[in-house]
Amino acid sequence: MAVVAAAAATGSTTRSGGGGGEGTRSGRKKPPPPPLQERVPLGRRAAWAWRLAGLAVLLLLLALLALRLLRHHGGAGGDGGVWRVALVCEAWFAALCALNVSAKWSPVRFVTRPENLVAEGRTPSTTAAEYGELPAVDMLVTTADPALEPPLVTVNTVLSLLALDYPRAGERLACYVSDDGCSPLTCHALREAAGFAAAWVPFCRRYGVAVRAPFRYFSSSSSPESGGPADRKFLDDWTFMKDEYDKLVRRIKNTDERSLLRHGGGEFFAEFLNVERRNHPTIVKTRVSAVMTNAPIMLNMDCDMFVNNPQAVLHAMCLLLGFDDEASSGFVQAPQRFYDALKDDPFGNQMECFFKRFISGVQGVQGAFYAGTGCFHRRKAVYGVPPNFNGAEREDTIGSSSYKELHTRFGNSEELNESARNIIWDLSSKPMVDISSRIEVAKAVSACNYDIGTCWGQEVGWVYGSLTEDILTGQRIHAMGWRSVLMVTEPPAFMGSAPIGGPACLTQFKRWATGQSEIIISRNNPILATMFKRLKFRQCLAYLIVLGWPLRAPFELCYGLLGPYCILTNQSFLPKASEDGFSVPLALFISYNTYNFMEYMACGLSARAWWNNHRMQRIISVSAWTLAFLTVLLKSLGLSETVFEVTGKDKSMSDDDDNTDGADPGRFTFDSLPVFIPVTALAMLNIVAVTVGACRVAFGTAEGVPCAPGIGEFMCCGWLVLCFFPFVRGIVWGKGSYGIPWSVKLKASLLVAMFVTFCKRN
């Protein structure tokens, strides 16, 4: 792994409580300092309206289960086996609904007051030196593949971080870049960007630039004529910076990797050429930053994100320093937002409703989940230290007289142990005069074998052994007793790029679901953390919802097959329209979709966005989650291994935004990946079932059959055809990347033929 310090802090990293002065002045007691944050719960009436709506859906699910149990032979001629399968699936759906009601029961949001970071008695023109007690921040950026994550993407991320507004930023902000792909191009691009940063950072602060990623700032919509001061000095500076950025882009794009290695530009990479490309744990950057700058706060960022709010760190400090008890903010997570996001979220991966409804509800329990990027961590929480660690615990758990326990936990580096001791016990770090003096130490602690025999990867740092180490790390921090906070700012603190197209989206969801499944069946299960640690019960339930996403796949797949099965075999799994029980599933269908629709309306989203997300939930469940479930099942049997798959990033940071003529970025695209086979097969099967059922009705062959399917089964098949319409279009009309490849069609057709044959025998 190559770790590059893009900028380094040279001042003290003293941790603070973030307040004003203390004591009295002239015998008079000082008033309390103004609050840095405000907890704002949802209004009582609105909160109870949402609770009752969620409970209504849950009660209808329970009523449907009761109907199944009372009519266990399937009602008017229904098959008991089919009803039992439906009962099991609906019981699972009821359990998920109950978990969702619990998670969303007490929604809370926090409003930050960065202007109150100025201590009492100071004017708004307070100088940077007067912010001396604000802690330093180490900013950790991760990239993995120079092809899918071009170097210019990483460069823009780093430049936006270096230009953040923060008092004494040159001393208190440090940026570390980890390239798991070991690319000389990425290292060369960062070296080139260092010179540009020397002019870019002062330019941003001098003119109050809002968006500090150059590729966004210099877009056509951000020209000097459309915003900013129009004086001659600004125009000259703007033109100069634009020319310099264009030169930087050309130098990076025109660099050849082989030429770098041949002429000595890649001398640092010879030992890394055979390193496996994978999602390397963020622990390496944690250790390197610890022996160099050792800031008490760490910001973790993916390489495809950039700073969208230059005061993001100040907002985070309001939440990290604004509580009476440090346990209230072990980490601060910013919601994921995306630039140039497609209208109405056609691929269901922007997750706005998830953050605004689900995560806001979890904030009322133990706090937001760690999302893997855009998160401010207390270093001591990442080190596995419980909140409010006191002197008595120091003697018992780590040992203050000798470094034996520190060596066991953190390894044999004296410098790393000293830095860990300072963080754990809230001591001031010694000012570092020369960063270069720690280069050899940094190389030592970043070695691949350094963590052998230590607690790194389990009790210390980011957790090893999972494709979703972010969720696992956040859960471990919560299990120690820490809480977390969701930082919602206007404008959003950070912006990233969302995958576009079917292959990229489904690959990303499959990777997440695989990691979530592995956590569920491991010793890191949140249920065990609740039983033996300090993870709260309702927080455990919230984790189970997210970790249980891939476990929904077999139940949703079985339920989706019931409609076609019943039509093809002349059976029913739902009450007939003439029966009293028909009103229960009908009311459930209407109430669930209405409740879900109103959630999207409350989040300020459109009806089309609701439909796109509902449709994608069905597609993701049958495709990405199903394959993830099978992958983990095979791994648990020792028949396969999970592999980390890097998701391609938006190339607009690195290309000239030249889109293919006539391309529709919101339309589903396909390739020959196995993830498309299950959905294609289910779409074909439902079309076949509707066609067969319609023919039976038209020709009267279903008359007189007591257990013939009713309108409920036809509605289920028709609804799934609507949900899978992108695949139907890809099967029938799609061409090129918009059409499903013949290899996928043939495999899906084989599955459909096997299912139809099975139905004929039953």
Curated annotation (Swiss-Prot):
Pfam families: Cellulose_synt. Keywords: Cell wall biogenesis/degradation, Glycosyltransferase, Golgi apparatus, Membrane, Transferase, Transmembrane, Transmembrane helix. GO terms for biological process: cell wall organization; cellulose biosynthetic process; plant-type primary cell wall biogenesis. Residues 1-39 are annotated as: Disordered. GO terms for cellular component: Golgi membrane; plasma membrane. Its main location: Golgi. The active site is at residues 180, 470. It is found in: Golgi apparatus membrane. Its EC number is 2.4.1.-. It is a multi-pass membrane protein. The chain crosses the membrane at residues 47-67, 81-101, 541-561, 582-602, 619-639, 673-693, 708-728, 739-759. GO terms for molecular function: cellulose synthase (UDP-forming) activity; cellulose synthase activity. It is an enzyme of class 2 (transferase). Residues 1-15 have a biased composition (Low complexity). Thought to be a Golgi-localized beta-glycan synthase that polymerize the backbones of noncellulosic polysaccharides (hemicelluloses) of plant cell wall. Belongs to the glycosyltransferase 2 family. Plant cellulose synthase-like H subfamily. This is Cellulose synthase-like protein H2. It comes from Oryza sativa subsp. japonica.
